[in-house]
């Protein structure tokens, strides 16, 4: 039997695509879907729009075999990026951000049913450029069972939707069903036997008066941790000389693993409803709720480390060492209500009010504050992060018929008011305060006893708010049968940094019914999130200064608020909005009603890009802070606007549907995205050079931290109850730069990933499915020189495959 490699699978799939007149494709209903995002016209499909729009139906999302929306979109869209490598105890284990076109995860706007979605309260500070320093929208909190389709606008849209829409817009459209339903269960795990996943999901539609509907949906489940690290072969106990002693070998932590978090429980709910009130007037509403607990393991402290770093109290508490675990408890909810009025004379009005809240509580287990001695608790609540947002919007659209245009002129206008709040609440005093033993000499070790600093302190606690008032005006015209144009302008006033106005021009010309060209130019902006404006954190160490002097002092490592007095001494300033310009040009080819091919090229320039600085060392910080109240700050980081970037790229998307008559139907889909981001400006901050504020590693994350290109290919065969989907992805090269030594930079090679999903639907509505994500157990390149105890073999910036192959089976029932 021949052995089929991932490359061979991709070649075979590509050859199959070439056997038909165009690139591969979805079904006709996908090509003919009227889009909501990016236009106010009611007669525009994805292929007829003046900007590139992808539409992925709920069925296509389910066929990927993915467990959540972010992973499903990663499989389908070459422009969408969502690194799925283990995050350990980092904030990414509770909420990871996704991105478009290689930009940051907070540079894409997320809508639900066309309404702005609130962001996470968490800011991810680890080494993912699409998450580092960003407070993004958590897409995993909306169940796949609730989704009718997802629309992705790959174009700047701040003039249409406001802040954040620099890379594009993701609009999640919920199901609208007045009857029927589905219930299903899925079980799966990695080929190593870990990461077991269980998920129950379903939806149900109910009829409401006056042709109304209520659709409820949910999913609930859990996932065990997964890891691909090696055993810890250190000597654990003080005085040990061999790892082969019974005490060393029998330590229960010998096989500890650093990896993905253990999702002990997660459940998500949605409700979507609309009901007619009178002629032309209807009321609508939708809501989401999510709860998730994630246990994220830190690095193991063996007894020797506990004794040396925390003292005899810690060693007595944990004689066999400790594996600290941070539990993140997430609660998220959003409610939207509104009225729609359709009047032949006045036009279409949409009045909506929505509120969204995201909060994350964190607790450390197996903790200890040595300075509290035996009074230190083992479980320490380390604080709450909470963000909420209220939006009040009034939108109006009217078509004006006239004799000099091919179709009526579509005019839209609107008003928007938004209130944003962000709160940091301090945790237990044991997590941040110095007890009576602080800085005293440990009678057993002879070392100074440190404190314990974790989570949010009283110094970090903050409550921030701001208000935004905006107005927009939009005109779209089908000037002739071949030529359409659109102009949009939006002005907003922010209570914390003033006014901004942005515009957009979009054009499209159809040379023939099969071939069209499109282009757009726009300006955009992204206001700094309150999370970025308000973040402050610190850790404290007791060190001997100067070494050998016997003079022990407390020194601080701080992340400073950008507008704080401490940051000002380093040259820091209050954050200002990012500003962008976006140019794109594209071609659309539809040789057949069921086939299409699009090509779009773009350039995105971003000025004042918001970035979390590197941790500045004591050699830089201490001379500046000498003689000030901040003299004990030894190293510091803060958010800053000192870099400008340019992103160039192009995207190719193709679709084809092949009717096989009595043998069913084949749907092909292909896409390719290439982008290149470069830093075009890097300013100094006060007396500190810019390349120290944003060092080599961070610069590398921005420029080379994501794959330079991505290819997606898929084929779906539908026949007499059978559905078979084969999908192939290729991630291009990417790089990790060493912070100090270019010789230690590592370039990671291209990676192929193959998925398979097979399902059969019985006549009674029962469907059985089985499949694999990463069928051939593909892995990214291993990290060079980092194969230490418990440390992952693969970079946390790896796009996919660090855990290997994932196999699953599911059962569902339609009723």
Name each model-derived stretch.
Residues 69-76, 98, 111, 137-140, ...:
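N-terminal periplasmic accessory domains that precede
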Residues 74-121:
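Extracytoplasmic beta-strand/coil segments of soluble accessory domains associated
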Residues 179-182, 192-298, 302-320, 324-344, ...:
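Transmembrane beta-barrel wall of Gram-negative outer-membrane proteins
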Residues 33-64, 121-132:
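N-terminal periplasmic "start-of-domain" segments of outer-membrane beta-barrel proteins
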Residues 120, 676-677, 728-737, 759-815:
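C-terminal beta-signal and adjacent terminal beta-strands/loops
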Residues 115-154, 202:
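Short acidic/polar hinge/loop motifs at secondary-structure boundaries
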Residues 314-316, 322-335, 344, 355, ...:
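Outer-membrane beta-barrel transmembrane domain signature of Gram-negative proteins
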């Amino acid at each position: 039997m021949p052995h089929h490699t991932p490359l061979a699978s991709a070649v075979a799939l590509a050859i199959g695509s070439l056997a038909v007149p165009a690139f591969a494709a979805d079904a006709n209903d996908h090509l003919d879907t009227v889009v909501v995002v990016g236009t106010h016209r009611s007669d525009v499909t994805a292929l007829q729009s003046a900007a590139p729009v992808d539409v992925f139906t709920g069925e296509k999302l389910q066929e990927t075999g993915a467990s959540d929306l972010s992973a499903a979109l990663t499989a389908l869209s070459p422009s969408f990026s969502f690194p799925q490598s283990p995050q350990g105890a980092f904030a990414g284990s509770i909420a990871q951000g996704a991105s478009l076109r290689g930009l940051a995860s907070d540079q894409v706007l997320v809508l639900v049913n066309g309404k702005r979605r609130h962001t996470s309260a968490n800011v991810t500070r680890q080494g993912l450029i699409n998450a580092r320093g960003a407070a993004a929208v958590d897409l995993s909190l909306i169940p796949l069972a609730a989704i009718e389709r997802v629309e992705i606008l790959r174009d700047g849209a701040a003039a249409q939707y406001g802040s954040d829409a620099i890379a594009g817009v993701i609009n999640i459209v919920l199901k609208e069903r007045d009857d029927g339903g589905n219930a299903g269960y899925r079980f799966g795990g990695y080929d190593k036997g870990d990461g077991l996943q269980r998920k129950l999901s379903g939806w149900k539609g109910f009829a409401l008066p006056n042709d109304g509907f209520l659709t409820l949906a949910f999913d609930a489940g859990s996932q065990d941790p997964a890891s691909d690290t090696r055993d810890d072969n250190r000597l654990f106990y003080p005085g040990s000389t061999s790892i082969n002693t019974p005490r060393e070998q029998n330590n229960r932590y010998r096989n500890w693993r650093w990896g993905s978090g253990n999702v002990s429980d997660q459940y998500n709910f949605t409700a979507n409803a609309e009901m007619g009130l009178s002629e032309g007037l209807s009321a609508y509403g939708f809501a989401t709720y999510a709860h998730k607990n994630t246990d994220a393991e830190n690095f193991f402290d063996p007894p020797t480390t506990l004794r040396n770093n925390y003292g005899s109290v810690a060693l007595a508490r944990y004689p066999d060492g400790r594996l600290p675990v941070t539990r993140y408890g997430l609660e998220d909810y959003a409610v939207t209500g509104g009225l729609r009025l359709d009047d032949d004379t006045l036009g279409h009005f949409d009045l909506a009010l929505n509120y969204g809240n995201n909060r994350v509580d964190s607790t450390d287990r197996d903790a200890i504050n040595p300075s509290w001695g035996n009074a230190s608790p083992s479980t320490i609540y380390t604080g709450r992060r909470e963000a909420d947002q209220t939006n009040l919007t009034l939108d109006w659209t009217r078509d004006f018929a006239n004799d000099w245009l091919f179709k009526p002129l579509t005019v839209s206008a609107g008003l928007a008011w938004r209130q944003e709040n962000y709160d940091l609440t301090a945790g237990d005093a044991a997590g941040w305060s110095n007890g009576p033993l602080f800085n005293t000499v440990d009678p057993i070790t002879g070392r100074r006893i440190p404190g314990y600093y974790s989570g949010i302190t009283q110094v970090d606690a903050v409550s921030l708010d701001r208000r935004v008032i905006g107005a927009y005006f939009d005109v779209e015209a089908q000037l002739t049968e071949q030529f359409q144009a659109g102009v949009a302008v939006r002005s907003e006033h922010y209570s914390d940094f003033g006014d901004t106005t942005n515009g957009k021009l979009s054009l499209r010309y159809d040379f023939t019914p099969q071939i069209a060209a499109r282009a757009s130019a726009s300006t955009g902006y992204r206001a700094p999130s309150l999370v970025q404006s308000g973040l402050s954190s610190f850790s404290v160490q007791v060190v001997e200064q100067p070494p050998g002097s016997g003079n022990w002092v407390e020194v601080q490592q701080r992340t400073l608020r950008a507008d704080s007095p401490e940051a000002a001494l380093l040259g820091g300033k209050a954050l200002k909005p990012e500003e962008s310009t976006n140019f794109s040009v594209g071609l659309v080819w539809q040789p057949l009603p069921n086939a299409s091919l699009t090509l779009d090229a773009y350039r995105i320039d971003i000025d004042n890009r918001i970035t979390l600085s590197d941790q500045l060392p004591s050699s830089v910080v201490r001379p500046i802070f000498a003689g000030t109240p901040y003299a004990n700050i030894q190293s510091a980081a803060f958010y800053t606007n000192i870099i400008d970037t340019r992103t160039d790229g192009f995207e190719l998307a193709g679709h084809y549907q092949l009717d096989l008559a009595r043998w069913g139907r084949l749907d092909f889909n292909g896409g390719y995205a290439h982008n290149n981001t470069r830093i075009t400006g890097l300013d100094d901050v006060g007396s500190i050079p810019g390349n120290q504020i944003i060092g080599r590693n961070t610069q590398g994350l921005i420029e080379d931290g994501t794959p330079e290109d991505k290819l997606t290919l898929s084929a779906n065969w539908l026949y007499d109850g059978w559905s078979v989907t084969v999908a192939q992805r290729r991630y291009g090269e990417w790089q990790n730069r060493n912070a100090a030594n270019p010789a230690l930079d590592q370039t990671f090679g291209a990676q192929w990933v193959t998925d398979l999903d097979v399902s059969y639907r019985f006549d009674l509505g029962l469907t059985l499915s089985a499949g694999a994500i990463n069928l051939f157990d593909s892995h990214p390149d291993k990290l060079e020189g980092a194969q230490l105890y418990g440390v992952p073999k693969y970079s946390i910036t790896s796009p996919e495959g660090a855990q290997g192959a994932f196999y699953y089976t599911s059962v569902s029932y339609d009723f």
